[in-house]
């Protein structure tokens, strides 16, 4: 098992160059679009990349934490309000796959993963999750030997390129001369130490991921005892090791220009007989980390040679392989039935708890009873129509300027072919009409009712007279439009004024929070009459509250269903059930389901989809639960 370490190091320079040539725009966007606390998970050598990513991410003012897969199991309370990112070279070890499944059940905001092997089991897992963003790279060097080498350099390079704050990262290895000089230093150092020495690795700042990696490599390849500490924590008692065990101890000092002064001051106070090796770089920030990582590999290679051990193939005992492949999931898996798990995650969404056990006994009883009553009532009801929101419900963010998701179309045509009514309640206008006409056969158009501009206007899909933009524009909306257009915002904003609605959009969605509060403040200072602010998954709508209500579509659908000889009750599905979400009225009805945000009310607007299944995927799940009878539709949980 393994590969010669020296052969692995020969490929490092090309691997680094390769990593900087890869496209990382999508990776950067996925990580930074929704800046929440970030929990980063990795095992073995990949954990070093996790610590590097912590430093990169925290440059943007948000906390991050690197943990192992087992740590994740004991950290479930923090996952729901965080983003999660998995780092794995192969994407197939038991630990990473089990922890990924655990994270899915905790419903983090985003579930990201990055892997150096396409079509891995990790990638296949991610394809089942609505909130997942998976990034596969095809590392030219293939799998590493026993220790993480080229995959680790590739992770460092890709992550640095994606997240470097200055976005001007250029790494040029100096190289041979620089590395040869360092090799000479290591030879001198190993003349002073022996295999039974303890290595005290001191670090700070961008050196920290390298300290983590040195501890990992020296322990995994059995090259030496390692103690790691930052320069100042070393002064809080850890220095005592040198006093009692200094004869068999040495120091490995990781130094960038930022640590040089603190290192010099520290070592002036230590016994002069203590051997010290400086692994040093003249680079700062992410570049400094990468330079130190490569030099640390040279140190590991030299340490192995001094002991007659090849770090890339040190020899692994049988029990080591058994430990690596240990099947331990049953220890941590709960035996709850699928229905119980679904009930608990639905209650967590409603109650805003981090985990179910955060609720008191009284709260658990209250919400369990509410869930049982809601689902029982839902499954007893008989429907003649289904009313859907558009954006975030049947049209995902990736298609927000185009058509609805193709996966949902067969479910809609099934509903229509069974003779029932489909309602679409949207904040948009004619673009939705076009999308529906493009997707659904014309013979079904008379069964489709559209509520345009948050249902200010309602008409059939085959009606060419709606929406009518010739209607008189509300004066209050016109005044707000003029105010916002004249204001100097820090990013580009687009405004579309309609008779009873002003739609506000921003091209770069990740910058929305920079202007959202300013827009609301300006509108509220105007103190307009009958004006309300609503938000969808892709825009903000300022509406004339006196004529706009998404429930305006309900009576149209009921009448159409009755005319077809169907029951007149409606099933409502949307994504923004909590005000200012633009479905808060639509999902206030008793038989209403959310595919994302829920309201706090216990008798409506439940999200009962599986963990981490949301938006269009959740809509598809709900539609798959429909059972069609001659004159009504039943909803059956599965």
Which role fits each region the language model picked out?
Residues 2-11, 113, 128-130, 247-346:
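Phosphate-moiety recognition in structured ligand-binding domains
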Residues 340-368, 381, 553-638:
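Mg2+-dependent phosphoryl-transfer enzymes with acidic/Ser/Thr/Gly-rich catalytic loops
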Residues 25, 31-176, 204, 245-282:
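Glycine-rich phosphate-binding loops that contact phosphosugars or nucleotide phosphates
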Residues 30-33, 99-103, 189, 403-419:
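Catalytic-core regions built around general acid/base machinery
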Residues 487-571, 576-586, 590:
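Conserved acidic, metal-coordinating active-site core of Asp-based
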Residues 379-402, 583:
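Asp-based phosphoryl-transfer active-site loop
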Residues 2-36, 130-248, 321-341:
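Active-site phosphate/pyrophosphate-binding segments
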């Amino acid at each position: 098992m393994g590969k010669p370490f020296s052969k692995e190091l020969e490929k490092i320079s090309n691997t680094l160059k390769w990593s900087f040539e890869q496209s990382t725009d999508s990776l950067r966007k996925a990580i930074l679009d929704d800046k929440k606390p970030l929990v980063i998970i990795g095992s073995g050598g990949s954990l070093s990349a996790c610590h590097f990513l912590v430093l990169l991410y925290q440059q943007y003012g948000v906390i991050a934490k690197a943990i192992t897969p087992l740590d994740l199991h004991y950290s479930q309370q923090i996952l729901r309000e965080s983003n999660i990112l998995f780092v794995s070279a192969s994407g197939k070890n038991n630990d990473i796959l089990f922890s990924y499944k655990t994270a899915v059940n905790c419903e983090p905001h985003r579930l990201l993963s990055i892997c150096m092997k396409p079509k891995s089991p990790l990638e296949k897992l991610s394809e089942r999750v609505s909130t997942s963003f998976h990034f596969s790279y095809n590392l030219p060097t293939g799998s590493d030997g026993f220790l993480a080498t080229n995959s680790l350099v590739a992770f460092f390079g890709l992550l640095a390129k994606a997240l470097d704050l200055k976005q001007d990262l250029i790494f040029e290895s100096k190289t041979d001369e620089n590395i040869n000089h360092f090799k000479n230093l290591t030879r001198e150092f190993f003349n002073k130490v022996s295999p039974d020495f303890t290595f005290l690795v001191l670090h700070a700042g961008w050196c920290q991921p390298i300290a983590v990696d040195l501890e990992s490599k020296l322990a995994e390849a059995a090259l030496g005892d390692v103690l790691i500490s930052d320069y100042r924590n070393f002064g809080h008692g850890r220095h005592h090791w040198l006093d009692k065990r200094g004869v068999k101890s040495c120091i490995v000092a990781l130094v960038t220009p930022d640590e040089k002064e603190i290192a010099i001051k520290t070592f002036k106070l230590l016994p002069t007989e203590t051997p010290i090796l400086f692994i040093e770089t003249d680079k700062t920030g992410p570049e400094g980390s990468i330079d130190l990582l490569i030099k640390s590999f040279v140190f590991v290679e030299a340490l192995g040679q001094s002991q007659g051990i090849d770090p890339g193939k040190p020899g692994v005992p049988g029990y080591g392989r058994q430990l690596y492949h240990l099947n331990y999931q049953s220890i941590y898996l709960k035996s709850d039935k699928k229905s119980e798990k679904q009930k608990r995650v639905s209650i967590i969404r409603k109650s805003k708890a981090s985990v179910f056990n955060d609720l008191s006994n009284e709260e658990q009883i209250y919400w369990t009873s509410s869930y049982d009553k809601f689902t029982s009532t839902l499954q007893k009801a008989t429907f003649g129509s289904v009313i859907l929101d558009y954006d975030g419900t049947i049209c995902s963010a990736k298609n927000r300027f185009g058509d609805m998701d193709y996966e949902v179309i067969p479910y809609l045509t099934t509903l229509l072919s069974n003779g029932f009514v489909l309602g679409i309640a949207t904040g948009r206008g004619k673009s939705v009409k076009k999308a529906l006409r493009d997707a659904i056969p014309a013979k079904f158009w008379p069964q489709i009712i559209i509520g345009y501009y948050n249902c200010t206007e309602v008409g059939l899909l085959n009606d060419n007279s709606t929406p009518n933009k010739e209607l008189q524009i509300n004066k209050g909306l016109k005044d707000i439009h003029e105010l916002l257009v004249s204001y100097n915002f820090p990013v580009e904003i687009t405004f579309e004024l309609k008779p009873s609605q002003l739609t506000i959009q921003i091209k770069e969605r990740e910058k929305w929070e920079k202007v959202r509060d300013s827009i609301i403040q300006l509108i509220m200072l105007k103190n307009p009459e009958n004006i309300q602010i609503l938000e969808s998954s892709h825009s903000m709508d300022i509406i004339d509250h006196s004529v706009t209500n998404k429930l305006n579509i309900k009576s149209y659908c009921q009448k159409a269903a009755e005319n077809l000889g169907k029951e007149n009750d409606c099933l409502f599905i949307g994504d923004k059930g909590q005000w200012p979400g633009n479905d808060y009225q639509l999902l206030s009805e008793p038989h209403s389901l959310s595919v994302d945000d829920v309201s706090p009310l216990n008798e409506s607007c439940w999200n009962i989809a599986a963990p981490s299944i949301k938006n269009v995927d959740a809509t598809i799940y709900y539609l798959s639960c429909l059972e069609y009878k001659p004159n009504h539709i039943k909803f059956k949980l599965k």
